[in-house]
Amino acid sequence: MFLNVETVNHQGINKVTENQTENLEDLFLIPREIPKFLLKQILELVYDIEISGSHFIPKTGGAVIISNHTDYLDVPVQGVFIDRKIVYLAKYELFHPQEDILAYVENPKSPFSKPPLSLMKPMIRLLVNRMGDSFGKNLQHWGGMPIIRNHYGESMDKKAAMGYYNQLEDYMVDILKSGELLSIYPEGTRSETGVMGPFKALAAKVAIRAGVPIIPTGISGAHNMSKPEAFLSGAAFKAKIVYNIGQPIPPEDFPKSPEKKAAKELTEELEKRVYYLKEHYERRGKPRKFITKL
């Protein structure tokens, strides 16, 4: 069963309240500060990480933060070195890790298909489902937002897929209007080569619709540094990773064109700024001289 927008709307970015803690599952929610602290210690132990421009992150209020996407490391570097809670779009499967395990358990060719292990299947189902649900709820509690990345490919229904993405976009706008900081990687996927790819207009579009600032950032040095080969060769240890946060573009500086054209124009400008930030981190977020006023 695939996640739909109604499910996201009810299970989305939850803030624990006294009423919610009456639910048994909520008792197992881990405060975001704990994994954030532990992950930060690990990252600083392994890598040489430098952050600049942190003062550009607004203390409160909705905003979109964007970056180039070079490696799995990009998300934890951004998430743990920025003080504010960040909302992330993440594939549905990450929130339901039990599905692959249960599929293996139910496979007729697995060891669990015959006694004595088959007698344990009910207990395994219960335990795995509980653990998977708890893990998924914690990811949401920490800022994860489950989405289906290829809804058209799954549903084979273009109309339904378009409806899903339109509703998802509406939901992202609602998140921003509620005051959250939403992270989007405009390339849409990680770069296999480390070379920044063309930006999609989603980040600009939701920022325009929500009327919130958009913060360009750039990361360098992380490409391939989470791969086993980087650790085996020693390249990962104390590798220099720089995450540079640029000056936000406020809504009043957005293009005044119709929405679709404005999103295209803003995306082109953001692509230039992110490229500059990842290439010239030593400038510490100083404005790029040839960037035009939007």
Regions found by a protein language model. Give the residues of each.
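A residue-level signal for beta-strand positions that form part of recognition/binding surfaces
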Residues: 48, 62, 144, 240-242
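Short, well-ordered coil/turn elements that cap or connect secondary structure elements
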Residues: 44-46, 81-83, 139-141, 209, ...
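Helix-to-loop junction immediately C-terminal to a conserved catalytic motif
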Residues: 39-69
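Hydrophobic alpha-helical segments of integral membrane proteins
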Residues: 34-42, 135-138, 172
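A generic local structural motif
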Residues: 37, 49-54, 74-75, 131-132, ...
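Compositionally biased, charge-rich terminal segments
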Residues: 2-30, 87-114
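Catalytic core of membrane glycerolipid acyltransferases/transacylases, capturing the structured
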Residues: 61-157
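Non-catalytic C-terminal accessory region of glycerolipid acyltransferases
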Residues: 2-24, 30, 152, 156-294
